[in-house]
Amino acid sequence: MSDMAYLQQFRDGNVTVLELSSKCRLLEEMLLDAVGQELMQAAQAALPPIVVIDLSRTEFFGSGFIEVLFRVWNRIQQKEGGRLALCALQPYCREVLEITHLDKLWPLYETRADAVAALNKS
């Protein structure tokens, strides 16, 4: 396990799990640079490049965080076999991703265990 200011990092089989901390309950603009930097750093270091972002503590994010997710996803996709999934989303956050059809790009899982099992299996 590795701790940063805004996220904790875990390994589960071949999957790197990035769990946003309670400081990220409301992912507003003033946090995005720091959170984005930590996510990018962790995504870059993930080997193999299979990452689950656990958003269980996040109740709100806007378009700025979606842009961060795109940057993280692009970084992961640069490596062979790169995959990104999101898990444990609060209803509002899940709805945002479904309305924008980003759930087609990034698989959404109800629980961290479901996400890790799916990515370890494939």
Label the model's feature ranges:
Residues W106-R112:
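Short acidic-hydrophobic, aromatic-tinged amphipathic segments that line or gate anion-handling sites
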Residues S2-Q37:
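STAS-typified acidic loop motif
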Residues L26-W106:
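Amphipathic alpha-helical interaction surfaces in cytosolic regulatory modules
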Residues L119-S122:
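Receiver (REC) domain switch/output surface
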